[in-house]
Curated annotation (Swiss-Prot):
Its main location: cytoplasm. The gene is bqt1. It is found in: Cytoplasm, Cytoskeleton, Microtubule organizing center, Spindle pole body; Chromosome, Telomere. GO terms for biological process: cell division; meiotic attachment of telomeric heterochromatin to spindle pole body; meiotic cell cycle. Interacts with bqt2 and sad1. The bqt1-bqt2-sad1 complex binds rap1. This is Telomere bouquet protein 1. Involved in chromosome segregation. During meiotic prophase, connects telomeres to the spindle pole body by forming a bridge between the telomere protein rap1 and the spindle pole body protein sad1. The lineage of its organism: Eukaryota, Fungi, Dikarya, Ascomycota, Taphrinomycotina. It comes from Schizosaccharomyces pombe (strain 972 / ATCC 24843). It comes from the Eukaryota. One of its GO terms (cellular component) is chromosome, telomeric repeat region. Keywords: Cell cycle, Cell division, Chromosome, Chromosome partition, Cytoplasm, Cytoskeleton, Meiosis, Telomere. One of its GO terms (molecular function) is protein-macromolecule adaptor activity.
Length: 132
């Protein structure tokens, strides 16, 4: 498993802004040089697909970490969803795991009208594994 990228994302759920982290891993190494156009495109595409899917999963399971604990029965990584992208034949596996790291400087975000909105840190973070 090879780390491709990691990023923090915010999303709205029930009029509350949440913060979580996603990390995308690939089966085989991918060029991480900033000049590598194909790798940049792959990262951007996978981040977009992942964000859309994660927002969808949160709409189905608002308390996804509690759901994962019930399914797994322990405080460790749980497979939540698996899908295959028809256009690329990539298989994507979505895992959640505990996110205990303290964050500083991410207490709020600025929304479109310029006001600051508080962020609530989720209990879980995401690991997406991409099989080529």
């Amino acid at each position: 498993m090879h780390l491709l990228t990691t990023t923090l994302i915010s999303f709205e759920q029930n009029k509350v802004e949440y913060l979580t982290q996603i990390a995308i891993y690939t089966q085989t190494p991918v060029c991480t040089d900033s000049n590598c156009e194909h790798a940049r495109f792959l990262k951007h595409s996978l981040i977009q697909v992942s964000i859309e899917r994660i927002e969808y999963l949160y709409s189905i399971f608002p308390n996804i970490w509690q759901f994962a604990l019930l399914c797994q029965g322990q405080n460790k990584e749980s497979l939540i969803h698996m899908e295959e992208d028809a256009s690329t034949n990539f298989k994507l596996r979505y895992y959640v795991l505990p996110w205990s790291r303290r964050l500083q400087g991410y207490q709020s975000i600025t929304v479109q009208n310029g006001s600051h909105v508080p962020l609530v840190k989720r209990l879980e973070k995401w690991r997406i594994f991409v099989e080529c």
